[in-house]
From Swiss-Prot:
Its EC number is 2.3.1.30. GO terms for cellular component: cytoplasm. The keyword Transferase applies. Pathway: Amino-acid biosynthesis; L-cysteine biosynthesis; L-cysteine from L-serine: step 1/2. The gene is cysE. This is Serine acetyltransferase. It catalyses: L-serine + acetyl-CoA = O-acetyl-L-serine + CoA. It comes from Staphylococcus epidermidis (strain ATCC 35984 / DSM 28319 / BCRC 17069 / CCUG 31568 / BM 3577 / RP62A). It is found in: Cytoplasm.
Amino acid sequence: MLKRMRDDIKMVFEQDPAARSTLEVITTYAGLHAVWSHLIAHKLYKNRRYVAARMISQLSRFFTGIEIHPGAKIGKRLFIDHGMGVVIGETCTIGDNVTIYQGVTLGGTGKEKGKRHPDIGDNVLIAAGSKILGNIKIESNVNIGANSVVLQSVPSYTTVVGIPGHIVKQEGRRIGKTFDHRNLPDPLYEQIKHLERQLEKAKNGEIQDDYII
């Protein structure tokens, strides 16, 4: 357990340039608190102490804004940055060295029983606001762009953006932008910029107002 906690703290320093000290990370990083609370809740869940497990997970949700079902299986060095609004479903599995930003949902698509949440591989980055839904698999070394909605399985070494999510980079063949979270395309932003360009053309008389969109 202590080794796991040390690894989690190390992951924070590797991923967040704002982290300045171990004391700061331990006392103020809500994502870390949510992950450590989940370790306790998950152990209780595996021992069929479901009510106690849910009580811990709900208490963690109250203090951190991050909801992780105690049944979810989480690998080593999970970094939840900012974290508010993150939801991780009961049958979800997450590999090692995964980074999740605020507003991410790893959820289901209906009221089906059994396996209904996604599996996330190793070394995956899931940017802010993304939704990965259903019994699908996100393989290792994948990047999910901000506000994407992913409904199908994704192969390794790819970058996915958009609604619905589609591959813009695979196996080193760059179609979209770079690996860095800050440079991943934002579909909503791009749509707004497109509308602004169309409005500017309309003002200049290049197109009729009826055909702006």
